[in-house]
Regions:
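Conserved AMP-binding A3 loop
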Residues: 1-17
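Conserved S/T- and glycine-rich ATP-binding loop of Class I adenylate-forming
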Residues: 1-2, 35, 78, 86, ...
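Short beta-strand-to-turn element immediately C-terminal to the catalytic PLP-Schiff-base lysine
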Residues: 10-12, 148-152, 173-174
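Conserved AMP-binding/adenylation subdomain of ANL enzymes
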Residues: 14-34, 41-84, 99
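Thr-Gly-centered strand-to-loop micro-motif
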Residues: 37-38, 63-65, 113-115, 161, ...
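Gly/Ser/Thr-rich phosphate-binding loop
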Residues: 56, 83-88, 97-157, 169
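Short Gly/Pro-enriched turn/cap motifs at secondary-structure boundaries
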Residues: 159-165, 179
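Conserved beta-loop-beta connector loops within the AMP-binding
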Residues: 171-188
């Protein structure tokens, strides 16, 4: 849908199980978690971040339906409802760090994940400096589940999506079609 009209992707009944890695490992959720994903329900990220893996992990899912994004609203919700985990595109974090975070009690927030676009290292650094929280990047598609991620046991490297999800074999290809060596850039 990001390059044209939305396209249908069929999944079978096993698809939700593929999100165990998303909810339990990448989002780092558990039974005491209150998780918010900022995603429209028409986007594949909604089932990624609001439903399958999160419920499998036993987390409570906080759903907020907004017609227009206001960063102060997100910060107020984190404060008022004691949200512990947040997943959003990097653009959301770009707007959050423009707010005066000292006006909000974000002490309940323990873990943040990002997906949907590349993360600017400056946004990562600013958010971490202001909150003490690392932004854990992930990559996947509607047709798959979480394919590459920075998992809780890893130290994030701004500009790197992380490592392959153990559920997948991932190969990065150079422009000539051969596999990229460790440290080389390539296409998934």
């Amino acid at each position: 849908g990001t390059t044209g009209e939305p396209k249908m992707v069929a999944h079978d009944f096993t698809y939700p199980l593929g999100h165990i890695a998303t909810g339990c490992y990448w989002h780092n959720l558990h039974e005491d978690s209150l998780h918010l994903t900022v995603a429209d329900t028409g986007w594949g990220k909604a089932v990624w971040g609001k439903l399958y893996g999160q419920w499998i992990a036993g987390a409570t899912v906080f759903v907020y339906d907004h017609e227009k994004f206001h960063p102060a609203d997100i910060l107020q919700m984190i404060q008022n409802y004691h949200i512990t985990s947040l997943c959003a595109p990097p653009t959301v974090f770009r707007f959050l760090i423009r707010e005066d975070l000292t006006h909000y009690d974000l002490s309940s927030l323990q873990y943040c994940t990002i997906a949907g676009e590349a993360l600017n290292p400056a946004v990562y650094g600013t958010f971490r400096k202001l909150t003490g929280i690392k932004l854990m990047e992930g990559f996947g598609q509607t047709e798959t589940t979480l394919t590459i991620a920075t998992f809780p046991w890893m130290e994030p490297k701004p500009g790197s999506m992380g490592v392959p999800n153990p559920e997948y074999v991932v190969d990065l290809l150079k422009t000539d079609g051969t596999s990229a060596a460790p440290g080389e850039q390539g296409q998934i």
